[in-house]
Amino acid sequence: MGTAQAVIRQDGDGEKLWFAGGGVFTIKASAEETGGAFLLFEDRVVRGKTTPMHLHPNEDETIYILDGELLVDIDGEQRRVGPNGVFVAPRGVPHAFLVTSETARLLCLQTPGSGESFYRDASDPVSSAADATRPPDLARLRDAAERSEAIQLLGPPPFTADQHEPAQTPA
């Protein structure tokens, strides 16, 4: 690991990347800036965005939900996680998520930050507001995963069509 730098970023600050898996990432603290200790990014996604079942062999992944709701599958157990909720997928544990709210804003922490090269390989700099709704490019996602040691794609998302709606709250 390298030497960490002091980092201060305000809301909206940071490098913005359109991710081939869907959504726009804003890098809040890069692996280079943290001496490789971690990668921290904000992810803005829309309803229906889902990840394939996957695992990170060398990184623990923590996702804090700032706004919105996700249906999360960690090692075969499915749970809904809403605002100010968190889920942790330790390295080597299969997981996936589905956005069930209209939009969601997530804070994603990967420790250590060695997986950043995968995200950069599967992303493009944001050039316009239209990038926020650009459709996923799953072929590019698979290609980037095959070149990376940071992620293993295990299969399709484990969610059914009827799970795409937000949880109903009692009246």
Per-segment meaning from a language model:
Residues 34, 71, 91-117:
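Ligand-binding loop in jelly-roll beta-barrel domains
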